[in-house]
Amino acid sequence: MKIMITISENSEAKELMPIAQAVHILVNKLPVAMRSKNKPGVRLEKGEVVDTNYEGYVLKVAIEKGEVVRATPIIGPYAGLPVIVAPIKDGDNVLGAIGVVDITAGIFEDIVAISRRPELYKFLPEDAFPK
């Protein structure tokens, strides 16, 4: 049996759920939110779906800009918590966005900058080690 998951600018929460759940598990059940460009999406916390009509201001910003956004929202369920949101693209067309609460608060970037281990160079993009 072949099953295909597709995402479009008009995907609804139920269509986004399998991908959002997979990412939620990959990040050890950190809060994850995902939406399409034109419709509200889904929000997961502690292994559970907590919202299937989630707008997400920072998700909308990432969709509008078409680039990764690192921000600390001032309103909403994640107010005061740093988040990282990435657009979901098909070429230059932004279909939606997915984000996670950044419990490291940027510590990972600091650790990479401090360590600058040469053996990591072959696994990471050049911009991971700014000059």
Curated annotation (Swiss-Prot):
Pfam families reported for this sequence: DUF2111
Subcellular location: Cell membrane
Name assigned to this protein: Uncharacterized protein MJ0405
InterPro entries cross-referenced by the UniProt entry: UCP006557
Lineage: Archaea, Methanobacteriati, Methanobacteriota, Methanomada group, Methanococci
Chief localisation class: membrane
Topology class, membrane: Multi-pass membrane protein
Membrane among keywords: yes
Organism expressing this protein natively: Methanocaldococcus jannaschii (strain ATCC 43067 / DSM 2661 / JAL-1 / JCM 10045 / NBRC 100440) (Methanococcus jannaschii)
Listed transmembrane segments: 68-88, 94-114
Any one of the GO CC terms: plasma membrane
